[in-house]
């Protein structure tokens, strides 16, 4: 993944290169089962849960001196209708805390994910340009004033291992 981030509040630009892995959870993954139980989600949802892990290198170097960060999040989609629902995340996209996000799938296949935290909200848009090329954009706003704090755009190329 190659992502550019624009922090409007700090008038900064960030370039990030990431390795992202998305995989379905295993039915016996103890971390996922605990996450489901802690959030009062039926353990039948373990079949829908998936894991996202990432390793990123950034120019800003916020995480440590060499600018590397990594992490993992459990995501559990809860369908409300064919095109809408919730995603319970163990770690959010913008804040490193648990969050319940709303999602909507548009007619063209674009996935919109809306997350609210204590003082900010984020809207992500994810769409596939081809089978192996995904684009993602996000806008982070202040909940108080709705001022735009940050925008980002990512191109993510699927790596197929043989």
Name each model feature, range by range:
Residues 1-162:
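Soluble ligand-binding/transfer domains with enclosed cavities or grooves
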């Amino acid at each position: 993944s190659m992502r550019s981030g624009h922090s409007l509040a700090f008038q900064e630009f960030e370039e990030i290169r990431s390795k992202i892995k998305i995989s379905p959870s295993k039915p016996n993954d103890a971390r996922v089962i605990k996450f489901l139980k802690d959030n009062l989600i039926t353990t039948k949802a373990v079949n829908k849960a998936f894991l996202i892990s990432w390793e990123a290198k950034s120019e800003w170097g916020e995480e440590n001196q060499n600018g590397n960060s990594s992490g993992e999040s459990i995501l559990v989609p809860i369908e409300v209708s064919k095109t809408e629902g919730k995603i319970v995340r163990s770690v959010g996209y913008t804040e490193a805390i648990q969050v319940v996000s709303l999602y909507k799938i548009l007619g063209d296949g674009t996935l919109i994910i809306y997350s609210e935290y204590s003082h900010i909200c984020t809207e992500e848009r994810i769409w596939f340009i081809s089978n192996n090329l995904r684009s993602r954009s996000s806008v982070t706003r202040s909940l108080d004033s709705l001022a735009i704090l940050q925008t980002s755009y990512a191109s993510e190329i699927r790596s197929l291992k043989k």
